[in-house]
Amino acid sequence: MAGFGAMEKFLVEYKSAVEKKLAEYKCNTNTAIELKLVRFPEDLENDIRTFFPEYTHQLFGDDETAFGYKGLKILLYYIAGSLSTMFRVEYASKVDENFDCVEADDVEGKIRQIIPPGFCTNTNDFLSLLEKEADFKPFGTLLHTYSVPSPTGGENFTFQIYKADMTCRGFREYHERLQTFLMWFIETASFIDVDDERWHYFLVFEKYNKDGATLFATVGYMTVYNYYVYPDKTRPRVSQMLILTPFQGQGHGAQLLETVHRYYIASSSVLDITAEDPSKSYVKLRDFVLVKLCQDLPCFSRERLLQGFNEDMAIQAQQKFKINKQHARRVYEILRLLVTDMSDAEQCRSYRLDIKRRLISPYKKKQTDLAKMRKCLRPEELTNQMNQIEISVQHEQLEEQFQELVEDYRRVIERLAQE
């Protein structure tokens, strides 16, 4: 019996030691993957140029780890404009194949699932491609040029936005490289069917000089799908939008979204512009752009705003800027906050009630549904449903929603003031 206890203790300790040993070979793929946009040869050794994914779960599972390596580095370096790629896997040590019957993850195979063939694996080949980068030019039609002040007070940076499609020579291959970034920065990203001609592509590039030549660097892009609306209209829907990490916080998202809106505004066949499953950050960006577009419309004058939302606002927003009624309502709420003195009790109360009347609509629908349920539910089922829409809880949720909205709206107003 004592011998059995000693054996059991040994097995527990052995298992613990093995697990500890195996844990040393687990790497966080969010930090193991190193991304870089290269303009100059010295960028290869410059850690400041390195940035990292926000998500890796689509390739490496929910725990976002790779097993079997110590000191794992997955290098994905892109030439800044053409996005010609160098892919290499480096590590200090790899788990022995005979070590407790475990195998290292096929890291290279996982990355190959999303990057197109034709990439480099060594620095010399990559630098040879970099020497030819002056030949790269943006795809498609130039829509907009704008500048961003230099943080050091030097010459402004110049950026351009283009609209492209798959008929542009070389664009299909370029897009295959560009879309790989989606997997690292959009949580639910997926690749689109590029053979569907209803996709539109909008690209942002930085225009810069290098050794007397004009070059272009990829900044970000947006894909838009054109849905048919009976009988003769289309509804462009923003599907994917990404500004690459080194360029974030510089206003490129707003420039891109406004340019896309202005592109579709010119088309009489477009009904309105929407977005597919928009993130909170996208909604905030859209709020800013739409308010900026609408703020000078007569229907959004101070006098009209204080009278409440009306059909004319929805009509004008749709006709002038292809904005649907729901988004026009948000524009109204932001602009009304702008002209409301929230320190004035009466103005504040009026604004609060106006917003809450909209927010309460889903709760009223639940009340209507409950009235119908009374006719067919058993008492215990009815009690359960009533508990879900308790009045006091409704008021708390409404107030919380209201405060969150006002906070978001104030940020939009602050950004408008900086324009």
From Swiss-Prot:
According to UniProt, residues marked as the site described as Interaction with histone H4 N-terminus are: 199
Family note: Belongs to the HAT1 family.
Protein name per Swiss-Prot or TrEMBL:
Histone acetyltransferase type B catalytic subunit
Listed under subunit, the entry gives: Catalytic subunit of the type B histone acetyltransferase (HAT) complex, composed of RBBP7 and HAT1. Interacts with histones H4 and H2A. The interaction is dependent of the ability of RBBP7 to bind to the N-terminus of histones. Component of the histone H3.1 and H3.3 complexes.
In which compartments does the protein localize? Answer: Nucleus matrix; Mitochondrion
Presence of the UniProt keyword Glycoprotein in the record = no
Q: Per the record, a Pfam family? A: Hat1_N
Gene name of the encoded protein: Hat1
Q: Where is the signal peptide?
A: none
